[in-house]
Amino acid sequence: MPSPEEQLARLVEAGFTLQTFERFPRSLGVLKGDCIALVEPTPEGLTLIGTPGWRMGEVMGVLVTKGGRQVFQAKGQTLEATPERVEALARFRAELESFL
């Protein structure tokens, strides 16, 4: 298993962007396009924390069903989960998981 440092280097080479968050000092944001996920370094390598979501300003919107339709929701904000956004998030997750 590659070290977290090697995994991060490979993610950057693949076009992902890394970001730290004060509220989550032990984790690191991994972004590509409008998609975002939190990862945490462990002795076994990087581990995905929770579910990837859609970046909505400085917060991550999670995919939920509200009022019978899918939306990304974060702190009272909602964003329509169009088929294109849902597909982009699925591609992001699959690509990210291939590095973890």
In which residue ranges do the predicted regions lie?
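Negatively charged, low-complexity tracts enriched in Asp/Glu with abundant Ser/Thr
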Residues: M1-G33
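Proline-rich intrinsically disordered, low-complexity coils
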Residues: P2-P4, P25, P41-P43, P52, ...
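N-terminal non-globular leader segments, chiefly Sec-dependent signal peptides
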Residues: P2-P4, Q70-L100
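Generic structural motif recognizing short loop/turn segments at the entrances and edges of beta-strands
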Residues: A14, R26, G33-C35, E44-L46, ...
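Phenylalanine-focused residue identity feature
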Residues: F16, F21-F24, W54, F72, ...
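Generic local-structure boundary detector
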Residues: E22, S27-G29, V39-P41, G57-G61, ...
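Intrinsically disordered, low-complexity regulatory segments enriched in Ser/Thr/Pro
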Residues: A37-L79
